[in-house]
């Protein structure tokens, strides 16, 4: 008889699971039975042999990512049910059913009770990204569930996990199409068109999580002179142009990002002379710019991906925000963000507070921003709340 692949917890270490937290850390494990390989589904038992969860096992600090707290098989029907539940939430909240929007996140990891899995929808293409070996091993079942749930609306499924999986010599994690391949890379977000580069772009090709914040920015753009730092695809710039900005300057250190921004401007506002893009380091640009702008967006990449880099990240946020607050015109509005999971809302707000004091400007908070509804936060997994932003009025 084959021994069940299972994890036995140390005494008392089931408490976080009883509160439905989806991670089991390696230090909580008494022993592992059945010789599971990385990415296998294991059954988790308390020290007195009570069933408590089932999930993917992986070498590392997070040893098991919980898929279910029910004693149920992890089979094709499981994946079908979970993706159907995720899609139903997007339908009921109006995210996936809008005629002017076919760009959204279908699965957001722990927020959809599928830790280690991201699925973004770009028109007729679904991009699957695994952040755990278990989700990599399950990718074909996940793709089958996508096909079943989205039916005729999805013609292409692209798998993009080369940069998100831990190094393992014995797994093939090459990016590529699971289904289709002759895909248009133009997607629509709230009536605006964007070139999505899921083959070579960051993340799955687009920062879907800023959709509602871009829409808010549009309401402030009319007649303003706008600077979009770390522009990447130019999302904020495109919304600002539609909102009636007088001028829009987009800055990114990557020339590829500038090319993509210019292409997105051209597809929405061909020949619009209000927009100029600069391939330049953000700090260098801020140092040399005059007091030319009254609406600035700071949306940098994650300054800290690990807790040991938190201190340097907070220094970076202070320096960046202080320079922007110093340079923005009186009556200016600053949209400033952090997407670092290890930077808490309190950390970020304190960094911006310190920046305002350094710049010696009177500053008021107009909005406190976060991720949109298609990036839900599991109430039992507060670590999932990673995006934080402030909209500031600078006198």
Task: Annotate each PLM feature.
Residues 1-121:
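Non-catalytic accessory regions of SAM-dependent methyltransferases
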Residues 107-120, 136-207, 215:
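Non-catalytic substrate-recognition/targeting regions of SAM-dependent transferases
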Residues 223-232:
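Conserved class I S-adenosyl-L-methionine
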Residues 233-246:
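Conserved SAM-binding loop of SAM-dependent methyltransferases across substrates and taxa
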Residues 247-252:
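Conserved SAM-binding motif I beta-strand of class I
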Residues 256-297:
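S-adenosyl-L-methionine
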Residues 293-323:
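Mobile active-site "lid"/loop adjacent to the S-adenosyl-L-methionine
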Residues 333-395:
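C-terminal catalytic and target-recognition region of SAM-dependent MTase-like enzymes
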